[in-house]
Amino acid sequence: MFEKNLLNNKRILVSGGGSGLGKAMATRYLELGADIYICGRRKSVLDETAKELMDLHGGSVKSISCDIKVPEAIEDMVDEIWSEGPLTGLLNNAAGNFISRTEDLSPRAFTAISNIVFNGTFYMTNAIGKRWLNENLKGSIISILTTWVDSSGPYTVPSAMSKAGVNIMTKSLAAEWGHYGIRLNAIAPGPFPTKGAWERLSPGQDTDSNENDSFIPMRRNGEMKELRNLATFLMADGCDYLTGQTIAIDGASHLGSAGNFYQGLNKLSDDDWDGIRNMIKSSNDADKAKRSV
C-alpha cells in the first residue's frame, strides 16, 4: 500500500509504544524507514519491544522511561531525543481507562485517568510543539482518541471527558500552529482488541471474542493493519493540507450504537460490578509489578 521508504528521515516518538496499539503503529513506522522512540513507564517492556522490533525489522528503536504525568520528565526526555536530532512526528497514544459506574469512582480513580489522558497528552504536545516553533520546524502530531468524543462515554466518564478535551486541543492547535507548518490530527478507533484494553474495558472477555459484533455495522472488530495504515497516512508527507481532523475508524459502530459501552453494561448488578472491579484490580496489580522490574 505504501512505498517501502515512505518514512525515511522521519524521527517519531510514540508514547505508550511498548505494547498494544502503540507498539503496532511504531512497528509500521519502523518498517517504512522511520527512526523510532518509544516511551512509557514500564522500562522492561519498552526495552523488550525495542529489541524485538529491531531484531525483526532492523532500523533504530530507542526506549525511554517517562511518566507523561510529570512535565519535568517529559522535558528531560525531549532534551535527550533532541541531542540526537529533532523529532518530525509525535504519536500521543499513552492512555488509561477502565469501566466503572461513575458513582463508584473516587477522586483518585478519576485523576489517575485524567492525569494521563488529558494532562499528559497536553504536556507532550506542548513540549514538542514549542521546540518546533522555536526552531522553525514543521511537524505532525497524531492523538489517539475514541468515537465517544462525538457521542458519549457512559461507564468510562474520566476517559471520555479527557479525550474530548484532547479532541478540542487538536482542533485548536491545528488553527493556532497551522501557519508554522505544524499539523495536528486525531484517530478515533473503534474495537481493536488488545490485551491491556480488554482486561479493563471488557474483563473476562477474550480478545478474539465476537460478542459485540452485533453493535458494529461491519460485524467485526478492526484489524491492526487498518489502524497502522491510517496512522501512517497521517504521519507521512503528501497530505500537508489535512489538519485539525479526528478520523473515526470503527466499522461505523459510532453511527450504529454511539460506539460506547452502554448496551453491554446498563443492566449489570452490584455483584457483577464487584466482580469487574476485582478483575481490573488484578490486571492493574500485574502492571504495577512490571513497572517495578
Regions found by a protein language model. Give the residues of each.
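Conserved glycine-rich cofactor-binding loop
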Residues: G16-G20
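Conserved mid-core segment of classical short-chain dehydrogenase/reductases
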Residues: E75, N97-T111, K130, N134, ...
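Amphipathic alpha-helical dimer-interface segment in Rossmann-like NAD(P)H-dependent oxidoreductases
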Residues: D79, P107, I116-N136, A174-A175, ...
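Catalytic Tyr-X3-Lys loop
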Residues: T88, G96, E103-Y123, I142, ...
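Short, small/polar-rich loop/turn modules that mediate ligand/substrate recognition or access, typified
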Residues: L91, G178, R183, L242-G244
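Catalytic loop of short-chain dehydrogenase/reductase
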Residues: L133, I142-G165, T170-H179, P191-F192, ...
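A glycine/serine/threonine-rich, flexible loop-to-helix segment
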Residues: H179, P191-I216, S257-D287
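C-terminal helical subdomain
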Residues: A186, D206-L242, I249-G251, I276-V293
